[in-house]
Design a protein with these regions (language model features):
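Class I S-adenosyl-L-methionine-dependent methyltransferase catalytic core
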Residues: 2-241
Length: 241
């Protein structure tokens, strides 16, 4: 994506999904939020900048990472679509140690790894326009992990009624990759017949104690987002050490 999104326009406004996410979090006083969630809300506002609403200038992952990274941290962004890649260059391209590639993200995993750094994060945020996306994700993860076994890999995926996520889990468990943590947050019942009911993250080589902290944090976040308790959260090791 282009790094920043106007949630008041287009499909975001038609679906209104943001109202049950960042829109709801912005309604709470900071004292009602956990320290981590409060930090995230402050970050969203800071990324939007002075005089801009967090709804009309909502930061995507490239903008958030750019805001959090240290001056010595390198960041490489891969975006297939020319218009979105140009938007990234306009917003982030002048920062030091930032490279923006107009290329397929899966190919970038192979081309950019291993980096010279021993530690780092690879974030894969696919479009998931079809269930075949899970196969591409798994192939990229296997390639990336083989080339950089000490790296942390984080993959976002949608929670839907389809069987593809379960097949992805089984294939990942059979891949031989170790230390695989799965984290989910759902705002709708598991048997919701259509659409996306929540989000999941698969994290390979997660930071120490991340699982314990998320197990404490996610239920509190869920209560803020879904006062009636619909849906739920999970933190599960798909594969241990």
């Amino acid at each position: 994506g282009g790094g920043t999104y106007d949630l008041s326009l287009g499909e975001s406004q038609r679906s209104g999904e943001y109202r049950q996410g960042i829109g709801r979090l912005l309604e709470f006083p900071e004292a009602a939020l956990s320290p981590e969630v409060a930090q995230y809300v402050r970050l969203v506002k800071a990324c939007a900048g002075p005089g801009r609403s967090a709804i009309t200038a909502y930061p995507g992952s490239p903008t958030i990472v750019a805001h959090l990274r240290r001056s010595t941290d390198r960041m490489v962004l891969a975006e297939t679509h020319a218009r979105e890649a140009q938007a990234l260059r306009a917003s982030l391209g002048r920062q030091k140690l930032v490279s923006i590639l107009e290329s397929d993200g899966y190919e970038a995993v192979k081309a950019q790894l291993p980096p010279r750094e021993k530690r780092g994060l690879v974030l894969i945020d696919p479009p998931f326009e079809s269930d075949a996306e899970f196969d591409r994700v798994l192939k990229a993860l296997e390639t990336g992990h083989q080339r950089w076994p000490t790296g942390t890999f984080c993959i976002w995926y949608p929670l839907t009624e389809r069987a593809a996520p379960l097949r992805f889990r089984r294939n990942l468990e059979a891949s031989g990759i170790r230390k695989v943590l799965d984290v989910t947050l759902s705002v709708m019942p598991e048997d919701t017949p259509v659409g996306m009911r929540g989000s999941g993250l698969v994290i390979v080589n997660p930071p120490w104690l991340l699982d314990e902290r998320l197990a404490e944090l996610l239920p509190d976040l869920h209560r803020l987002l879904v006062p009636d308790g619909t849906g739920g959260t999970s933190v599960e090791w798909w594969v241990g050490e």
